[in-house]
């Protein structure tokens, strides 16, 4: 089973409406949709977000740098999801193709794209912070496109091995949750994913239009 996981906040709620409409129209094969928002934004959510979809809504006591906090929440999405797989969707993802998302997992392996850092342009900015997280050199960038699907087990294992993950993220100054997840899985859970180097990968049209919201979801 696959749960759809969205971390959002008040500035992205209008965009979230369109995201949810596109999920309702185009996506099948998921177990549930989980949305996590700051507690302080709950009333705004109630007034802005309108959907016929059954949503499992969680509110959290957000603090400090919201951009970093939302990344910690994504790193610990297993706390809110029950399924074997978690599909990350941001509020500014608008799906435009019909798909059963079960087809995105082949033989128990979701696809994760990666590109050598020498070829990623401005995304080189994520290299140093990911290396700090890994405590090792990282050669590849893993935040190639959304949606991304990860094993729930991967997230839970990372948190178990790094019980101070919240402090690590919140005090990092700069962090990239999807690069951290990708780099860790590439080393420790490689057999659980289909890692595809974009040098050898045959281009496939993305499932969604990725818009630019407010740099934190």
What is each residue range found by the language model?
Residues 6-8, 37-39, 213:
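Short beta-strand/turn micro-motifs composed of small residues
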Residues 1-18:
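N-proximal low-complexity "stem/linker" segments adjacent to membrane-targeting elements
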Residues 21-30:
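Short, acidic, metal-binding catalytic loop of nucleotide-sugar glycosyltransferases
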Residues 86:
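Short aromatic/hydrophobic "clamp" motif used to bind/position activated sugar donors
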Residues 95-129:
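Conserved donor-nucleotide/metal-binding helix-loop-beta segment in metal-dependent transferases, i.e.
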Residues 134-214:
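Catalytic core and acceptor-binding pocket of nucleotide-sugar-dependent glycosyltransferases
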Residues 38-80:
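Active-site-proximal specificity loops/subdomain of glycosyltransferases
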Residues 90-94:
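The conserved acidic donor/metal-binding loop of glycosyltransferases
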């Amino acid at each position: 089973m696959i749960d759809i996981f969205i971390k959002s906040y008040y500035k992205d709620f209008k965009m979230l409406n369109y995201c949810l409409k596109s999920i309702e129209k185009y996506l099948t094969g998921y177990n549930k949709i989980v949305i996590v928002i700051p507690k302080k934004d709950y009333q705004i959510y109630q007034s802005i977000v309108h959907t016929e979809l059954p949503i499992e809504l969680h509110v959290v006591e957000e603090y400090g740098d919201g951009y970093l906090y939302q990344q910690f929440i994504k790193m610990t999405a297993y706390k809110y999801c029950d399924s074997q797989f978690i599909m990350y969707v941001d509020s500014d993802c608008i799906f435009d193709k019909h798909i059963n998302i079960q087809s995105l997992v082949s033989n128990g392996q979701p696809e994760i794209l990666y590109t050598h850092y020498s070829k990623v342009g401005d995304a080189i900015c994520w290299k140093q912070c990911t290396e700090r997280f890994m405590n090792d050199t990282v050669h590849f960038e893993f935040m190639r496109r959304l949606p991304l699907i990860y094993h729930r087990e991967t997230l839970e294992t990372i948190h178990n091995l790094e019980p101070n993950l919240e402090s690590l993220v919140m005090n990092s100054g700069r962090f990239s949750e999807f690069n951290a997840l990708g780099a860790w899985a590439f080393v420790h859970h490689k057999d659980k994913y289909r890692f595809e180097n974009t040098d050898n990968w045959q281009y496939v049209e993305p499932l969604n239009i990725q818009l630019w919201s407010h740099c934190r979801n």
